[in-house]
Amino acid sequence: MPRRGAEGPLALLLAAAWLAQPLRGGYPGLNMFAVQTAQPDPCYDEHGLPRRCIPDFVNSAFGKEVKVSSTCGKPPSRYCVVTEKGEEQVRSCHLCNASDPKRAHPPSFLTDLNNPHNLTCWQSDSYVQYPHNVTLTLSLGKKFEVTYVSLQFCSPRPESMAIYKSMDYGKTWVPFQFYSTQCRKMYNKPSRAAITKQNEQEAICTDSHTDVRPLSGGLIAFSTLDGRPTAHDFDNSPVLQDWVTATDIKVTFSRLHTFGDENEDDSELARDSYFYAVSDLQVGGRCKCNGHASRCVRDRDDNLVCDCKHNTAGPECDRCKPFHYDRPWQRATAREANECVACNCNLHARRCRFNMELYKLSGRKSGGVCLNCRHNTAGRHCHYCKEGFYRDLSKPISHRKACKECDCHPVGAAGQTCNQTTGQCPCKDGVTGITCNRCAKGYQQSRSPIAPCIKIPAAPPPTAASSTEEPADCDSYCKASKGKLKINMKKYCKKDYAVQIHILKAEKNADWWKFTVNIISVYKQGSNRLRRGDQTLWVHAKDIACKCPKVKPMKKYLLLGSTEDSPDQSGIIADKSSLVIQWRDTWARRLRKFQQREKKGKCRKA
């Protein structure tokens, strides 16, 4: 039988949706006529630039299971259909039997192919009257943006009815719309309340579409955006975007229309005439994809999900896919696709995160921060070399070998961090080279790890033979060493200190020779607490002239001496009583033994 009761543009919308139903129902034979050519992706324009795209408008209820709280036929029961002939009402009674397909009225008839010439109707048990109710619950399978909910009746329309929606797959329910001739009594709502910007996300109650007539074929159609003040600017109305979103729809029939004869003597016949019967339940809308997909598909688990584009992800394309966090996720609009943008990590990172503060500081252009930069890079964009590496300017920053190791010399360099651009290591005094691996001009290598390069003396220091004539009384003044001298525990114990020195340079200072020496090892400490490193050695000019001690530049010696005050109150003094012997490497072990014996108090016995 033809539909009646739809009004205005909504009727055209419902008609178009009804005509589209067979195509949605799955007739594979129709596909043989389809042109087998690749269709352009609606989510991108002809230049490949992203643009808003939305799935097709569908009747999302078609073919889906509806859970109902009451269905006639279990056990078989009588029902009577009321028709009007003039002013007379005529009842014709029938049997509802769930086990007989010809007499059954199952819930599947709510969402099957609706053929006006062969109506199939779901039907409830007779006379389920207020305060009892009958509910129809439909799961859409995922979030949809619902445009309308419509029901076409085989019975008179309910006197009171409510439509609810769920956004969390039936865990909680929110009112969508109320219909009643007594809104205040049934739902504690005023009838036909004005919709304003302040309450446009609230359900209202209306007494329209609640007449008892027509007795069959009546339509109730609820438009989710009709009369909502900001519907014209839906893209910029998060309130309405949330309002139309649903995963489930529930219809509650609260109160039957009656003719007032249900309490008369033959009330049993009358009560068998009052029931709810619906030939078609439609939920028109689009798969919710936030403007980032043009269709919904089945995933591996057979769940309905958006086929996301614009680098988005999620069942509703409601987040950016991994590594595309350079700006925050946004819903696409007619003006801006708001695609997610990949982080700029110069091919050195696989993960990143979004930082709102950086995004704001950049003028809302970039907020991505790269995580775990590889290939020896560092920084928010993996755009410079980490400590200990420098840029190889012959390669782009995106190259996996864009950063080279500094390779600073472990002795010549003052640290392992080099210049990020040139690779120049920080060199110690007198050291040069990009890795600090050689002595600078005017310097020569030493064996000291502290000062590996020392300045070359301008001229060799004068010796006793060249600078000062040997005094005539040297034989009576001191006894110069001749041949090889030996060291023993007794000699070691008699002296205040014992050190290995390297003579670096010498200069005359009045009656003294001032030697710059490098103390390589300390085998015995005096009161002045000698330490390794550069030190000043003072020797009286007469002692040098008499060759006691006899020293030469750039030679190493073992010096055993006594603690005396030096001319400038710094350094150490060697005199004719000091023991200065050219160094032999074999002495190191013997001197360590002397040192251990001294610690045990052996020097006091010697």
From Swiss-Prot:
Netrins control guidance of CNS commissural axons and peripheral motor axons. Promotes neurite outgrowth from commissural axons but acts as a chemorepellent for trochlear motor axons. These effects are mediated by distinct receptors. Glycans are attached at residues 97, 118, 133, 419. Residues 1-25 form the signal peptide. Pfam families: EGF_laminin (PF00053), EGF_LMN_ATRN (PF24973), Laminin_N (PF00055), NTR (PF01759). Its main location: secreted. It is found in: Secreted; Cytoplasm. Residues 474-603 form the NTR domain. A motif (Cell attachment site) lies at residues 532-534. It comes from the Eukaryota. GO terms for biological process: anterior/posterior axon guidance; Cdc42 protein signal transduction; cell-cell adhesion; chemorepulsion of axon; glial cell proliferation; inner ear morphogenesis; motor neuron migration; negative regulation of axon extension. InterPro entries: Galactose-bd-like_sf, Laminin/Netrin_ECM, Laminin_N, LE_dom, LMN_ATRN_NET-like_EGF, Netrin_domain, Netrin_module_non-TIMP, TIMP-like_OB-fold. GO terms for cellular component: actin cytoskeleton; basement membrane; cell periphery; cytosol; extracellular region; glutamatergic synapse; nucleoplasm. This is Netrin-1. Keywords: Cytoplasm, Disulfide bond, Glycoprotein, Laminin EGF-like domain, Repeat, Secreted, Signal. It comes from Gallus gallus (Chicken). Residues 49-286 form the Laminin N-terminal domain. Residues 287-342, 343-405, 406-455 form the Laminin EGF-like domain. Disulfide bonds join 121-154, 287-296, 289-306, 308-317, 320-340, 343-352, 345-370, 373-382, 385-403, 406-418, 408-425, 427-436, 439-453, 474-546, 493-603. The gene is NTN1.
